[in-house]
Amino acid sequence: MKNDVLEKIRDRSVVAAVTHDHARVWLLNDESRDPVCEVTRATPIVRHVRAAQDHHGHASEVAEVPYFTELAAVLSVASNVVLVGHGVGKSNAVNRFINHLDVHREALRNRIAATGTANITAMSGGQIIEEARRKWAQADH
C-alpha cells in the first residue's frame, strides 16, 4: 500500500466495507464519499474445478490470507475501525476477517469499534458511511 494512503488513515477512525473479493476504506468523519483506498483479493488459480465452481468450496479461500493480511496492514494505522460486511455466517467476509485478526493481529482486533451487516453491493459509498456511523453511535463512541 502506498505511504500517502497510510498517512491519510493514520490515527483516524475508518470504515471498511469488506466483501469476499475486495474491501473499500473510508474515513469515518470525513465528508468525502470516495473511498481512501481499495484492497482487492487476488484471483486464485483454480485447478481441476469447473469455472462455475470457482467461488464454491475451499479453492475460493486460497487467496484469502494474503487479502486479509494486506487489509490488516492498511487498517493497522487507524485509531478505530468500523467493519461492515455483506451476508451472514460463513458468507460474511467480516466474520472471517475478524477470525484472521484473532490469530494474526490481536492489537488491530482490539481497535475494531463496531461491526455490522448491510447490503453493501447495493449501497453507495455515502450510504455505507452513514450505516457505519449508526453502528459507531450504537457502540457508544
Region roles according to the model:
Residues 1-141:
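Terminal alpha-helical anchor/extension segments at protein ends
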